[in-house]
Amino acid sequence: MTQKRLTEAEKEQLRAKYNPEGSLLRNDQMELLAMLDAVADICKQHNIEWWLSSGTLLGAARHDGFIPWDDDVDIVMLKRDYKRLKRILLNLDSEEFVFHCAESDVEYVNTFGKFRKRQGRVRVASRRYDYYRWRGVGLDIFAIER
C-alpha cells in the first residue's frame, strides 16, 4: 500500500480548516514544539537517542509538521534511556517545565511520562484531569524494549 503525498495546497486546506494560525490548537502546537526542543536539548546533552512516534511521526511525514488536529507530541526511546531521562527530568530545576509521572504525582495513572509546562492550561474538560497536579498540553515520552 502506498501513501499518497499531500500537495502543498491540500496541506494548507487542512491547516486552514482544522488549525488556522492563532487558534488555540495552533498555539498549543507551537508550545509543544518549544517543549520538544527543550527535551531534544536535554537528550543531546546526555547522549540519549529518541525518535518521533505515533501521530507525531505521521504528521512529520505526511504534513511536514503536525497533523492539523493533533494536540500532543509523542516520542519514544529505549527503556534504559527512558529510565535515565526520567531521573534527569525528575531532578530538573526548572520554573517552566515538569516531568509528569507516577513518581511526581500519585494521581497520574499513565504508564508513560509527560513533559509539561508547570502552568499549563486545560483545553478539554475531563474528570481524569481534575486530580492531576499539572495539566495542559504535554509531550508524551514512551519506552520500548530493544
Predicted regions and their residues:
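Short hydrophobic/aromatic beta-strand micro-patches
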Residues: V76-L78
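Conserved catalytic core of two-metal-ion nucleotidyltransferases
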Residues: E12, A16-K44, L89-R146
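Conserved SAM-binding loop
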Residues: L85
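Generic secretory/membrane-interface signal
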Residues: K4, F66-P68, Y108, W134
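Active-site nucleotide-donor binding segment shared across nucleotidyl transfer reactions
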Residues: A40-V73, Y82
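Conserved oxyanion/phosphate-binding beta-strand-loop segments in alpha/beta enzyme cores
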Residues: T2-E8
